[in-house]
Amino acid sequence: MGALYCLAGLPGSGKTTFAESFLSEHPGMEYFSPDQYYEKINGDECDRRNTFEVWHAMFGDIHKAEVEGKDVLIDSDNITYAQRTQWLEWFPNFEAHHLMYFERPFELCLERVNSRRRTIPKEVMLAKLGAWDSPVDAPDRHRWDSVVCL
């Protein structure tokens, strides 16, 4: 059976940059990001319509990888305990579940997000910061095979 690697952190914290490097070191690993699915379904990752279809397609593909015993990397914000726990509950048949999280200064994240094609308003970023549940004290920490701050 494969392993599930889940990234967590604010937008702009370095998740996707890390993912690119991690994937190059782990050939054959499947990569899943909502941005990919917005691009595939809507034709543009900035077009945030069809949210249900995007997540439904992504979850279906992750399930297929789980059944096939593949390793997967999930690149999404996963800022709350509930968002992270869903991966454990929906995909329990992976051999291992690893959480890798990023805590960066808010202003750095905001600066990085504002340099992208798809920007996020400061108010939305502040709301995400306020919702951030640090994995250090999370009640589900013991359910992960490893929890690493990168």
Residue ranges and their predicted role:
Residues 2, 28, 69, 94-96:
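A general structural motif
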Residues 2-8, 13-16, 21, 25, ...:
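Conserved GTP-binding G-domain of TRAFAC-class P-loop NTPases and closely related GTPase folds
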Residues 6, 32, 75:
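Conserved Rossmann-like nucleotide-binding pocket used by diverse enzymes
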Residues 17-70, 108-110:
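Conserved substrate/cofactor phosphate-moiety recognition/catalytic segment
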Residues 36, 76-78:
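Short strand-turn motif at the edge of the Rossmann-like AdoMet-binding core
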Residues 40-44, 66, 79-118:
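ATP-dependent NMP and nucleoside kinases share a basic, alpha-helical "lid"
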Residues 50-57, 79, 83, 124:
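Soluble or luminal CAZymes and related metallo-dependent hydrolases
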Residues 71-76, 99:
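Short catalytic-loop micro-motif centered on adjacent basic/acidic residues
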